[in-house]
Structures are given as C-alpha cells and as structure tokens.
C-alpha cells in the first residue's frame, strides 16, 4: 500500500515550514514564535528538527507528554488498537478497553467514592463540565476562582482564568465569577511574604466566605489549581488547600481542583492535591491522562453526580486510542513509581538551580513541586520590595528562553509578564538528562546576560 500521509522529513529548512505555516495558519499561533523549528522526529526527552538538530525537550507538550515522546509501550498500545478492529470513535458507548481504562484510573482514588465523566478532549471542556455540574447540583450560579489561575480558553473557562491578555479582547464572558488572591510566598498579594503572607490569604478566604456582608452571594463552587502552572508555577501551601477544603465542606460549596497540568506524577504525587491529604469534590483531568492523545475526564464524588441522562454531552468522549495510551501510561506510572522519580529528579534540579542562583542572582526564586518548577527571573540591580522580592525582569527571561533554544533546549515561560522560566519535562526523565539540562540552562543564562546587560 502506498503511504498517503506526508510524515517523512523532506530536504527543507525549518524556515521553509515556518514560512508556509505563516501563510496557511491564523495569527493566533504561539509556540512557533518562541520555538521556531519544525519537528521531524522525537523520542523520550529528545526532539529532532527537519535540519537534523537535536533538542532536549523540557516542555513536553505543555505537560501532556508525561512519558516523553513516542514511548515504545504507548506506540505498541496504539498499534494493538489499530490491529484489533476496535472502533476508534465510540461516543460514550463502552468497550472492553474503556472499561479497563476506567477501572485503572479509578484505582488512584479512594475506593468506591468517585465516578468518572468523560468530557470533550481538552482541559477547557472538562472545566466547563465541572462548573456546569456544580451549578446543577447546588442550584447556585456564582463561582470563586483565583488570581493567576488558568483553566482554558473557552468562554466559561476563560472567565475563570486570571490572565487578562486573552480576556480583554472578549466581552460577555460567563458572569458570576469572583476572584480571590492566591497565596504566593515570594510575591505575596498582600505584601507580607513568606509563611505569614500565605496565612493571611487563608484567613482572608475564610472570612470572605463566612462574612455575611462580604457582598458575594454563596457560590456553587471554588475552583483552583494546587499548583498554578501558567500563572508562574506557584504551589499552594498545604495549609491553604486544607483550609479551602474545610471551609467549602462546612458551607456546602463544591471544591473543584484542576489537575490538568499538575496531575499524573508531575508534582511527586499522582495528583498535586494529595500533598495536602484532601479529597476534592471534582477533579479535572486532561493532558497526561490520555497518554499523549486528546482525552479529558472528571472524577466526581458520587453524591454530587446530579446529571440527568444527556445533561452534558460531547462528541469526542470515546477516543479509543487515547484510552489505550492512557491505560498504558497509568500502568507505567504505577509500576515504575514515576511519582517518586519526579520527586527525586525535582529535588536535584531545585538544588542545582539554587546553587546556580548564587552565581547568577538574576535567578531570584526557584520553586515548585516535583518536576513542575518555576525559575523567577529578576533584576537584582534594583531594590527589593517589602517582601524581599526583586522586580521581574521579563526582558531577560525572554532572552534566556531564546538562548536556550540556540543551545538546543526547549522550554516555556509563564507568570506575570512571562518572567518565570518553567520546567515541565517528562516525569520519567533520567539523571543524566537532568544534568544536561543544568549545563545547557547555565550556558543560556550566561549568553542572555551578555545580550541584555552588557
């Protein structure tokens, strides 16, 4: 049979494909502007472009590729489905594969407490479903979200998102969203900093909910990330997550935790909320849940399953290839204890980066959990604020990312103004690859400083 899919690399430059992309695709595209190359092949934590250049990938599909690129067991899972005759698309009809995937995913939650809801294929779809369910169950319309949070780009999910860049261009987003400050020990929203600042946010949240004159109607739900990713890799303190759980339970408010990016071993636990020992009412999952393919799922405490049949539907709920790769990924995560690997590799990277900050004080803060880390790039030549934080240096952070690309290291930035360099590699990364990251990142900092500050 003649191959009809143009997957073979042709003799052309990265710029050739970027120019064609510029002609054929909308101005909305983002990653090619900062990472200007065209994929030819990839394996594990390594990517090769059409010119033969090899890169160390610390982006991992924005967290989707928990096992890296083209893991052989996942590739075999895809082949097995293709050879089986199983339909690739089944709506919400069941199959033996879906049954096995569902059982495996539920095994990571407390026994007999949760059920699954398959939604559309993206995290935004799943967050929309979670909010709709909370409103259906409670009969209330308001939602509390947090500054710096990111929950997707659809109308409802965008209304829950803190970043104003995408929101300012769109009117009439979902009403009834009240934003609260998110604890940040380095850049405290109350200007206190450290543990005291985090405690102040806890007290503010509790008072806000319980104050009969706060001006906010009792919400249907509180939605948050246990680790804010796009917001600059900010980890919620354990006590804060516990306080939110305590207050929401006390007042009959659903607690929704968005684990789209932080979930599936990335934080050093299967789910980031597990660090606090809590049980959310709804857990939102996408990205890594599908083993690199599109899939999104809610885990819902059984007592909150208020849906009527067909109360929330979606065409792409039955992606059998994603369930195959998702099932295989879950087995590998458990069998190889990848949560522990993420914890150990994350500790190494954190310590190495903090040592690097002594030599290069533009690295103002290194934070995160496991292999979800943020490197806060600052202008240490300026005065610190009242909490001890230097001003953000967004220009230098952009230059570091650009230098990383030249040094064949792929990564992304986040946070206010994009001053936080993000570590989001595969959770099965090995020690030598982590050491190579430090080597390339250090050289990139040196190169960027020469460009921006010399």
Swiss-Prot record:
* UniProt GO MF annotations: diaminobutyrate-2-oxoglutarate transaminase activity; pyridoxal phosphate binding; transaminase activity
Give the CDD domains listed for this entry: OAT_like
Q: Does the keyword Transferase apply?
A: yes
Instruction: Write down which residues bear the modification named N6-(pyridoxal phosphate)lysine.
Output: 287
Question: Which Gene3D superfamilies does the record match to this protein?
Answer: Aspartate Aminotransferase, domain 1, Type I PLP-dependent aspartate aminotransferase-like (Major domain)
The alphabetized UniProt keywords are: Aminotransferase, Pyridoxal phosphate, Transferase
**Does the keyword Transferase belong to this entry?**
yes
Q: In which pathway does it act?
A: Amine and polyamine biosynthesis; 1,3-diaminopropane biosynthesis; 1,3-diaminopropane from L-aspartate 4-semialdehyde: step 1/2
What's a GO biological-process term for it?
biosynthetic process
Q: Which InterPro entries match?
A: Aminotrans_3, Aminotrans_3_PPA_site, Dat, PyrdxlP-dep_Trfase, PyrdxlP-dep_Trfase_major, PyrdxlP-dep_Trfase_small
Q: Under which EC number(s) is this enzyme classified?
A: 2.6.1.76
Similarity-based family: Belongs to the class-III pyridoxal-phosphate-dependent aminotransferase family.
Q: What is this protein called?
A: Diaminobutyrate--2-oxoglutarate aminotransferase
Q: Which gene encodes it?
A: dat
């Amino acid at each position: 049979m003649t191959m009809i899919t143009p997957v073979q690399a042709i003799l052309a430059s990265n710029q050739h494909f970027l120019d064609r992309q510029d002609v054929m695709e909308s101005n909305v595209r983002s990653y090619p502007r900062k990472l200007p190359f065209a994929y030819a092949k990839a394996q594990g934590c390594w990517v090769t472009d059409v010119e033969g250049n090899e890169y160390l990938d610390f982006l991992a599909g924005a967290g989707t590729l928990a096992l890296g690129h083209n893991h052989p067991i996942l590739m075999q899972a895809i082949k097995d489905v293709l050879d089986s005759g199983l339909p690739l698309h089944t709506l919400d009809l069941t199959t033996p594969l879906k049954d096995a995937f569902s059982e495996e995913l539920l095994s990571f939650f407390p026994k007999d407490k949760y059920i699954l809801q398959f939604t559309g294929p993206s995290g935004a779809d799943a967050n929309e479903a979670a909010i709709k369910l909370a409103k259906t169950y409670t009969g209330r319309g308001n939602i509390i979200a947090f500054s710096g949070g990111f929950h997707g780009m659809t109308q409802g999910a965008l209304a829950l998102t803190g970043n104003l860049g995408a929101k300012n261009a769109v009117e009439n987003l979902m009403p009834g969203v009240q934003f609260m400050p998110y604890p940040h020990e380095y850049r405290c929203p109350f200007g206190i900093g450290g543990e005291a600042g985090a405690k102040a946010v806890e007290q503010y949240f509790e008072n806000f909910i319980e104050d009969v004159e706060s001006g906010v109607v009792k919400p249907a739900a509180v939605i948050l990330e246990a680790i804010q990713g796009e917001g600059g890799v900010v980890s919620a303190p354990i006590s804060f997550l516990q306080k939110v759980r305590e207050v929401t339970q006390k007042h009959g408010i659903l607690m929704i935790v968005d684990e789209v990016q932080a979930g599936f071993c990335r934080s050093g636990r299967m789910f980031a909320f597990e660090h606090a020992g809590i049980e959310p009412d709804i857990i939102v999952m996408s990205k890594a849940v599908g083993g690199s393919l599109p899939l999104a799922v809610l885990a819902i405490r059984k007592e909150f399953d208020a849906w009527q049949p067909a109360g929330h539907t979606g065409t792409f709920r039955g992606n059998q290839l994603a369930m195959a790769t998702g099932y295989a990924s879950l087995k590998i995560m458990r069998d190889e204890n990848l949560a522990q690997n993420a914890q150990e590799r994350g500790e190494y990277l954190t310590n190495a980066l903090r040592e690097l900050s002594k030599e290069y004080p533009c690295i103002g803060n290194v934070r995160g959990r496991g292999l979800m880390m943020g490197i806060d790039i600052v202008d240490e030549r300026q005065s610190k604020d009242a909490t001890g934080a230097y001003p953000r240096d967004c220009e230098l952070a952009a230059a570091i990312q650009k230098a990383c690309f030249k040094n064949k290291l792929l990564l992304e930035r986040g946070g206010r103004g994009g001053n936080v360099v993000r570590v989001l590699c595969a959770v099965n990364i090995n020690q030598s690859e982590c050491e190579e990251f430090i080597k390339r990142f250090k050289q990139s900092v040196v190169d960027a400083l020469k460009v921006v500050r010399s």
